[in-house]
Amino acid sequence: MTITPQHLIALLPLLIVGLTVVVVMLSIAWRRNHFLNATLSVIGLNAALVSLWFVGQAGAMDVTPLMRVDGFAMLYTGLVLLASLATCTFAYPWLEGYNDNQEEFYLLVLIAALGGILLANANHLAALFLGIELISLPLFGLIGYAFRQKRSLEASIKYTILSAAASSFLLFGMALVYAQSGNLSFVALGKSLGDGMLHEPLLLAGFGLMIVGLGFKLSLVPFHLWTPDVYQGAPAPVSTFLATASKIAIFGVVMRLFLYAPVGDSEAVRIVLGVIAFASIIFGNLMALSQTNIKRLLGYSSISHLGYLLVALIALQSGEMSMEAVGVYLAGYLFSSLGAFGVVSLMSSPFRGPDADSLFSYRGLFWHRPILAAVMTVMMLSLAGIPMTLGFIGKFYVLAVGVQASLWWLVAAVVVGSAIGLYYYLRVAVSLYLSAPQQLNRDAPSNWQYSAGGIVVLISALLVLVLGIYPQPLISIVQLATPLM
């Protein structure tokens, strides 16, 4: 297949981020300058975001058999780039106090962003696997970046070993799917499944193994055991990336796979996914109840959020509202998580050893950093799905999709899970307004709102509130991005 100028325009975000990786690498080799390399990374990610406008003008097209660039790919590419940009801005003040190599952090984030963009555009199982590896490998280094901290190193080793095992399951599953169908392309797989091949034991075994591999990457129950330890051990800016960009990119490609290859038509697959969704919602929320560490709490809550999204995925065959529900929910989850982890990053900067992730560190925050406490409150309310926040709109969509598809037991799980979640999110919010301890262990810088990370946190809070009250602009963007069904 010949690559035309139109194809190059469609691949602009991928090419720009790839070029930024090379530029930052050469810059580090030439001269170590933290500010310069952070600026280059942010400029590259912003340029990739702006280039999405030109991609939109070029229209939908297949670029090689591996990738399809369309509205859907643009939406998920945009979300991944926003998460990567936020990670870099949160990391800068954190790295200011870090005495080892600072610049490589941005290099690893850019390579992981490259993997996320590839996943958003993937239209083939080979591209899916390459994207997942490209996003996972830099995370091994990022999670263990504070390697002098025992917990960070332990989290990195744990994630590396389990991720390698999950990748082998995924690859073996793909091999079985290929052995039975003779295809790896999503569209060709869809045609094979349409010919009644879906009930072949080998194909079902292949999809089963793929669910194990992808379930690990998305930290769904029972493949979730790494999640709380890794979220707690990783530096706060890395936990931000882990909770947002990697989950969004992988869930996006799973949506596309289910869209073209209607795996959900198999009753066996639907039951397995339903049980995983139910267990993730209930278990994730129950485990978060007893947490006194904010990063662990957000780790367990991310398990339940992916469970909610899985409900929309199971209902995908019932109509295009599922696509809309996932897009809106992921946007709400992105901004809410960026705000919550952003506050933790600001409180933990500059690097002084362990992060400020104990719930006690946030007790009485309102009395000395009122705006920061207000931002954290908004994020907790949005994650809990309280009306007038973007989180509520996403949860409402998921419930509507579940009702439309008559998935009553999963709808009940969403309602019960949300009720449990309300308790621990409000527990964090209430602690912000209690009387402050006499001596502060950790505190955000006094001028935090003028830093790049502070601005990102404030914008996230504003978007969560504005789009929670008037979600139409976001819904319109998501509808434009889902003309596939």
From Swiss-Prot:
It catalyses: a quinone + NADH + 5 H(+)(in) = a quinol + NAD(+) + 4 H(+)(out). InterPro entries: NADH-Q_OxRdtase_suN/2 (IPR010096), ND/Mrp_TM (IPR001750). The chain crosses the membrane at residues 8-28, 35-55, 71-91, 105-125, 127-147, 159-179, 203-223, 235-255, 271-291, 297-317, 326-346, 373-393, 408-430, 455-475. Its EC number is 7.1.1.-. One of its GO terms (biological process) is ATP synthesis coupled electron transport. It is a multi-pass membrane protein. It comes from the Bacteria. NDH-1 shuttles electrons from NADH, via FMN and iron-sulfur (Fe-S) centers, to quinones in the respiratory chain. The immediate electron acceptor for the enzyme in this species is believed to be ubiquinone. Couples the redox reaction to proton translocation (for every two electrons transferred, four hydrogen ions are translocated across the cytoplasmic membrane), and thus conserves the redox energy in a proton gradient. NDH-1 is composed of 13 different subunits. Subunits NuoA, H, J, K, L, M, N constitute the membrane sector of the complex. This is NADH-quinone oxidoreductase subunit N. It comes from Citrobacter koseri (strain ATCC BAA-895 / CDC 4225-83 / SGSC4696). The lineage of its organism: Bacteria, Pseudomonadati, Pseudomonadota, Gammaproteobacteria, Enterobacterales.
